[in-house]
Amino acid sequence: ALALAEREIPCPRVMALYRIPCAKREAVRYRPLPGKTLRELIRAGEEAPALRAQLGRFVAGLHEAGIYFRSLHLGNIVLTPDGALGLIDIADLRASGKPIPRHRRLRNLKHLMRDEQDRAWICHPDATVFDRAYNIALGQGAADRA
C-alpha cells in the first residue's frame, strides 16, 4: 500500500499487518477504498468508452511505475467517487523502481482478460479503445521495451 500511495495510486489504507507463521502467510486489515469495482459497474450496464480508455491508461501507468499486481482484474480495480481508478486486494502486489518487463506486462494483461465478461467489456464494441489508450500512455514503441 505504501508503494501505491507514494505513486499517488488510490488504494485501501492498511490498518494492521498480521503474520501467520504456521501458514507462512500474512493477513492485512485495511480501511476499504470507497467506490465501485469496474466489474460491479459493467455488470450493472456501464458501457462508457471513456472508462475503457481510462483503464488502458491506468494499467499502462501501473506497468511504467513498476507495479506488478498478479491479481489484476476488473474486480480489483475501483472507480473512486472522484473519478480516479484505484486498486484493492493488493496483498500480492510487487513494486520496483523501474518499469516492469514486457513478459510480465503480457502476463498481467492476459490475467486482466481472463474473465470472459471482463474481456467482453474491455474489447467491445471497439476493441482498440483500451489498446490505444495503453499504448499512448506508454509512448511510441514503449510497449516493446524489454
PLM regions with names:
Residues 1-37, 54-65, 69:
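Conserved ATP-binding subdomain of kinase catalytic cores across diverse folds
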Residues 12-15, 75, 110:
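A short, local hydrophobic-aromatic micro-motif
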Residues 32, 79-80:
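Conserved hydrophobic "DFG−1" position in protein kinase catalytic cores
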Residues 37-46:
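AlphaC helix of the protein kinase catalytic domain
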Residues 48-52:
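Short alpha-helical scaffold element within the canonical Hanks-type protein kinase domain
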Residues 72-79:
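Hydrophobic residue at the +6 position relative to the catalytic HRD Asp in the kinase catalytic loop
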Residues 81-85:
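Active-site beta-strand-loop-beta-strand hairpin of nuclease catalytic cores
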Residues 86-146:
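C-lobe/activation-segment region of protein kinase-like
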